[in-house]
Each structure stands twice: as structure tokens, then as C-alpha cells.
């Protein structure tokens, strides 16, 4: 039975067990991930994040082909042990973990490329947290019908890809949002082959204040269940509401989640429109746990 040195971290309540494995020698089983994330018998988290040198694993070497400066790879695993392409909250906490453990230097205002299964993502340190360029986004997955427990009727959703798949559903009120039981995975028709995160979103009234769009949301994450926050989900929700609102909709958004507030912005680049995410990150405590 080996010991694992870990750090518990969180971003707007989306929490993770992080550990450094530069040489790529610690390959957790699905059962071990589930045990670490168990909130009653383990540490408790929405997922695990391994910091591994990109050169030491195949997915990381693919990131180096994209950007030779992407020295570190974020190996994210969901509660059930399945690998995830990307985590918008996780990558901010991951970057802070690298800084605090002396694995990188990143003064405020500077940017570091991080390898993920969705490709390389650039993370900039700011005075109050981190900003992440999530890259190009796309309408993907069509408009499946979404059935969520305790919502009376099926609702049309909108498929959005921001490096991982999402389906966004607009609701009419915060009361309706509160009624939904996201302990159960919403049912999608048709069901995406790889599954999807599902966001239930309520636009504010008024929607736009001082040029910034405002929305409130909850999320059920594929492989993890309902979480207090989902960074890529916040980006997908803002993109969907902007799409539905039309040409007059803003490119800056404030997204209220149960765990806090995230900022989302859309901006042009040479390879198309990108979406960015901003928010806090915190390392909560360090520890050692025995791996079964």
C-alpha cells in the first residue's frame, strides 16, 4: 500500500484532489479515483488532477507537438475515474498548484500554456485569480430534448463544444431552476455518443447591465454528477444565451453558480472566435493518504 502526497484545491466550490507526478509513474485505477473522491470515506472531491510532465505520457506529447512550451499536462479524472478532456475550474487550480509547488514561475500578467486532452490552453495569472483561453468553440450536438427530474416537461437544449461537450437548457425562472433534481443525470434525446454535461440556465431580467450579460445556472457534470460550479459549463451557458439573444447580445458575461461567480468573454482571434473564462483558485490543505 503506497502513500500519496496530495493537495485539496477548489475554484468556486468545484473541488479537486491534486498531486504531482512529474515522471508519470502514478497511474491511479478507476477504483482509487473513486475512493479519493468519496466524500464520506475518502478525501472528497469532484475529480482528481495529476500534474505530469507532458513529455512522459502520450497525451502530453501530443500537446508538445501543438506547443513546445506546454511543459506540464493536466491529467483530469472524473469522480467515476473516467478521463475528462478539459476542466475550466480545474485548470486554474492546477496552475496555482504548479506555482505554489515551485514547478513553474508565473508572475501576475504572464501566461503559461498547459496541456490538456482538449489541446493546449493558455492560462494568465491576474491579481485576483486566473484567466483561461478555452480556445475555439462550436455549435455541436444539435438541439436534443432534455428531461430533468422534477421539471414538468422536456425542454429543448443546445449543444455547445468548448473542448468538451455540453447541452444548455434555458429555464424561465430561478424557482424553476431550484426545483430541478440534478442528483439524477438528465436524459438527452438523442443521447450523445460520449455523453455531455448539462447546464440549466436562467437569464437575468434585465439580461444586460452596463454592457455585461448576467445569467444564473446549475450543472450536472458527466461522470461526476451535480457540482457547485463548472467552468467550461459557464462558458457554454453564456455562449448559448448569447446565441439565443441575437446580434445585440454582449461578449462579456457574469455567470452566477452555486459556488460563486465566473466571468466569460468571447473574443476574435486569427483562427476564429475564442471563449475565455476568469475566476478564483484556492489551495485548501495538503495531506498524505494511503492508496489501497
Swiss-Prot record:
It catalyses: (2S,6S)-2,6-diaminopimelate = meso-2,6-diaminopimelate. The active site is at residues 87, 230. One of its GO terms (molecular function) is diaminopimelate epimerase activity. This is Diaminopimelate epimerase. It comes from the Bacteria. Homodimer. Gene3D superfamilies: Diaminopimelate Epimerase, Chain A, domain 1 (3.10.310.10). Substrate binds at residues 14, 78, 88-89, 164, 197, 221-222, 231-232. Pathway: Amino-acid biosynthesis; L-lysine biosynthesis via DAP pathway; DL-2,6-diaminopimelate from LL-2,6-diaminopimelate: step 1/1. The keyword Cytoplasm applies. The gene is dapF. Its EC number is 5.1.1.7. Catalyzes the stereoinversion of LL-2,6-diaminopimelate (L,L-DAP) to meso-diaminopimelate (meso-DAP), a precursor of L-lysine and an essential component of the bacterial peptidoglycan.
Amino acid at each position: 500500500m503506497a502513500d500519496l502526497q496530495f493537495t485539496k484545491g477548489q475554484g468556486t466550490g468545484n473541488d479537486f484532489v491534486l498531486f504531482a507526478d512529474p515522471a508519470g509513474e502514478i497511474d491511479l485505477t478507476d477504483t482509487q479515483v473513486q475512493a479519493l473522491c468519496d466524500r464520506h470515506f475518502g478525501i472528497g472531491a469532484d475529480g482528481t488532477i495529476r500534474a505530469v510532465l507532458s513529455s512522459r505520457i502520450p497525451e502530453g506529447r501530443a500537446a508538445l507537438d501543438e506547443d513546445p512550451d506546454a511543459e506540464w499536462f493536466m491529467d483530469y479524472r472524473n469522480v467515476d475515474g473516467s478521463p475528462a478532456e478539459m476542466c475550466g475550474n480545474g485548470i486554474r487550480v492546477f496552475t496555482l498548484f504548479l506555482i505554489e509547488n515551485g514547478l513553474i514561475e508565473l508572475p501576475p500578467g504572464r501566461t503559461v500554456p498547459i496541456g490538456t486532452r482538449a489541446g493546449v490552453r493558455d492560462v494568465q495569472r491576474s491579481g485576483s485569480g486566473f484567466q483561461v483561453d478555452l480556445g475555439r468553440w462550436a455549435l455541436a450536438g444539435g438541439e436534443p430534448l432534455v428531461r430533468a427530474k422534477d421539471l414538468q416537461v422536456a425542454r429543448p437544449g443546445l449543444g455547445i463544444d468548448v473542448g468538451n461537450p455540453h447541452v444548455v437548457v434555458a429555464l424561465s425562472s430561478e424557482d424553476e431552476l431550484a426545483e430541478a433534481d440534478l442528483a439524477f443525470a438528465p436524459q438527452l434525446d438523442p443521447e450523445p455518443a460520449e455523453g455531455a454535461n448539462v447546464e440549466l440556465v436562467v437569464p437575468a431580467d434585465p439580461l444586460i447591465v452596463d454592457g455585461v450579460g448576467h445569467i444564473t445556472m446549475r450543472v450536472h457534470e458527466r461522470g461526476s454528477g451535480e457540482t457547485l460550479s463548472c467552468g467550461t459549463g459557464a462558458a457554454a451557458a453564456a455562449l448559448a444565451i448569447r446565441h439565443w439573444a441575437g446580434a445585440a447580445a454582449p461578449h462579456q458575461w457574469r455567470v452566477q453558480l452555486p459556488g460563486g461567480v465566473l466571468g466569460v468573454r468571447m473574443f476574435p482571434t486569427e483562427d476564429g472566435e475564442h471563449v475565455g473564462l476568469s475566476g478564483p483558485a484556492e489551495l485548501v490543505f495538503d495531506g498524505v493518504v494511503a492508496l489501497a
